[in-house]
């Protein structure tokens, strides 16, 4: 099935489950502990119980390690029995992420 968000991806995602915390939902405040499905150096696909709007910003942090970032919601789609799958683009990363940026 064609999905428009896949056309703009500049990096291949790596399937990897990483425990993370996300926060910053305007209508449902609080911190949500969840996991990634796939990752790259500049973003991740994460599952959430909440519906997010495209271009919303949220706080993203790993449970283990020291990585954190403000992230932009690139897309949000319903995910059966889980809630929603969201594509995140890291905007202000700090610390060590599980995938290093490509050398330029």
Describe the function of each predicted region.
Residues 1-104:
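Structured alpha-helical
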